[in-house]
Amino acid sequence: IVYAILLSVAGLIFSLLINQLCFLLALSSFTVSSLYNALFKKTGLLGNFMVSFCVAIPFIFGAAMADGISAVSLIFFLMVFLSNTAREIIKGIADVEGDRMRGVLTLAVKYGGKYASKVAFLLFILAILLSPMPYILGVMGYMYLVLVFIADLGFIYSSIKLIGNPSKHMALRTKKQILLWMFIGLLAFLFGTIFA
């Protein structure tokens, strides 16, 4: 715990050396993660949102460190936030038995795997609707569009399969598949930047 605190303090100090906005972003991420660990681990969807905020904030932080926060950096933040929240919900389907015993109020625990899988699908669709925007705005090159299209198809395929069979086994399988589609999405971001 002491080591983690020291690292967090060091990170906050270094972010302040960059600029005030980076410090505020780092502080917000530290605050959200601390609150999650202390109070909100068992809150289900709210906890999912908090985890996803911390996962997605590096896109905003990177923009603040470079040229400043833009519409495209906010789009990437939202895409990662939405898709990671969907994955957290799917993790809840896979862990529903243990979560129920521990009193974790995930969507799967409260409303069942079928309902949770549909919410995850909806979040993926929202992220997918945003995905062409960086190309349309002229920030990303054609390689981005090709790779993000593959990732989008993967998200749709995996989430539809889960709706059809929202079992623990299928949720575990889907959770792993989602990591692959996310990795392809990351490649889309990298190659789209290089070949812009």
Each language-model region and where it sits:
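Extended hydrophobic alpha-helices typical of membrane-associated regions
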Residues: I136-A196
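Interhelical loop and helix-boundary elements at the membrane-water interface
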Residues: I1-Y3, S34-C54, D99-K118, K161-I184
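Intramembrane alpha-helical segments
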Residues: I1-A71, I75
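Alpha-helical transmembrane segments
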Residues: A71-S83, M140-Y144
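Multi-pass membrane catalytic core of lipid/isoprenoid biosynthesis enzymes
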Residues: I1-L27, V104-M140
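Transmembrane alpha-helical segments that form the membrane-embedded catalytic/substrate-channel core
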Residues: T31-A38, I57, L78-I93, I150-L162
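Residues within membrane-spanning alpha-helices of integral membrane proteins
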Residues: A4-S8, A26, F30, N48, ...
